[in-house]
Amino acid sequence: MAKAKFERTKPHCNIGTIGHVDHGKTSLTAAITKVLAKTGGATYSAYDQIDKAPEERARGITISTAHVEYETADRHYAHVDCPGHADYVKNMITGAAQMDGAILVVSAADGPMPQTREHILLARQVGVPALVVFLNKVDQVDDPELLELVEMEVRELLSSYQFPGDDIPIVKGSALVTLEDGDPSIGEDRVLELMTQVDAYIPQPERPVDRPFLMPIEDVFSISGRGTVVTGRVERGVVNVGDEVEIVGLKDTVKTTVTGVEMFRKLLDRGEAGDNIGALVRGTKREDVERGQVLAKPGSITPHKKFKAEAYILTKEEGGRHTPFFTNYRPQFYFRTTDVTGVVTLPEGTEMVMPGDNVAMDVELIAPIAMDEGLRFAIREGGRTVGAGVVSSITA
């Protein structure tokens, strides 16, 4: 059967299901596609189709992720679901599957469990903007007071990780009942209600082109008679000929003006997110600019050395370290286009970090890098990736 072509007229949003093992993340994913297939907004993906997610390699890390897509009346969604807990950890930290929001699935029969807590913490650390809760398996709970208790517990847990626990929509239903065409009042109707809440509560992400201009510098050339050209792929925003920009990172921030933009050797009047461009910068010497710096809209990003991060450390099988590391570990941190050495401080009570662990840590770099919260990086030793991380907060 030919796949229906999705019309890209609706705003697009990336979401995923998170939560404890066996609480019903994959069943809910299947249930959403089943219900939306009735209105032509999806192709039904059965549980076992989603469950045998293919392995992908992102930044040298093996991650199993299932991708489904569907649309509601208001939006087009790309939805990720991971088979194993480790896959979630890797996915959220590497940003392999970007999440603009997530559906937290909690079994009403069990209440919040350790991975529920860990996924909420990860969502907070990696900057997932909003969560909606699906309280699943309500068909297994006879006592309405028990349901209320579980709901209160989930709200308190969300609040303890700085999510607005009192305001987050919680929809109660059963993914399994939906898949088995059972009672719609806890099945299909609840899945539709969930999607209405997701549409309304998860904010529409800003398109990269609407954000302040930023281009990581990959290379620098000197063109006789014209000046210095920096090249790279525009990460966000737009740059027009004549715009004032800053060169940020590694050294003191310098202001300059873009006097020319070219792409594939053709002159343009602007470059935008996704374009590989060369930008001619006025009055800048070739030796003043280097790979690893960024070209950015003035005042939109600042250079920093110290930050808190959430990181995943590769296993030996993934090509990572064979041994643990301790506080004062000094690897290289690869941001955008370059490596910078940094010193790691582990949190109190964490003696060491084993390959395969994920950890919150403090890092101090030897040179400042243009960064904002949510920036992803690789941890490397001599060019070999041994970990992946995300900046959760900037400390200096």
Curated annotation (Swiss-Prot):
Monomer. GTP binds at residues 19-26, 81-85, 136-139. Residues 136-139 are annotated as: G4. This is Elongation factor Tu. HAMAP family: EF_Tu_B. InterPro entries: EF-Tu_GTP-bd, EF-Tu_GTPase, EFTu-like_2, EFTU_2, G_TR_CS, P-loop_NTPase, Small_GTP-bd, T_Tr_GTP-bd_dom. Keywords: Cytoplasm, Elongation factor, GTP-binding, Hydrolase, Magnesium, Metal-binding, Nucleotide-binding, Protein biosynthesis. GTP hydrolase that promotes the GTP-dependent binding of aminoacyl-tRNA to the A-site of ribosomes during protein biosynthesis. It comes from Gluconobacter oxydans (strain 621H) (Gluconobacter suboxydans). Its main location: cytoplasm. Residues 10-206 form the tr-type G domain. It catalyses: GTP + H2O = GDP + phosphate + H(+). One of its GO terms (molecular function) is GTP binding. Residues 60-64 are annotated as: G2. Mg(2+) binds at T26. It is found in: Cytoplasm. Residues 174-176 are annotated as: G5. PANTHER family: ELONGATION FACTOR TU, MITOCHONDRIAL, ELONGATION FACTOR TU-RELATED. Residues 81-84 are annotated as: G3. Residues 19-26 are annotated as: G1. Belongs to the TRAFAC class translation factor GTPase superfamily. Classic translation factor GTPase family. EF-Tu/EF-1A subfamily. One of its GO terms (cellular component) is cytosol. Its EC number is 3.6.5.3.
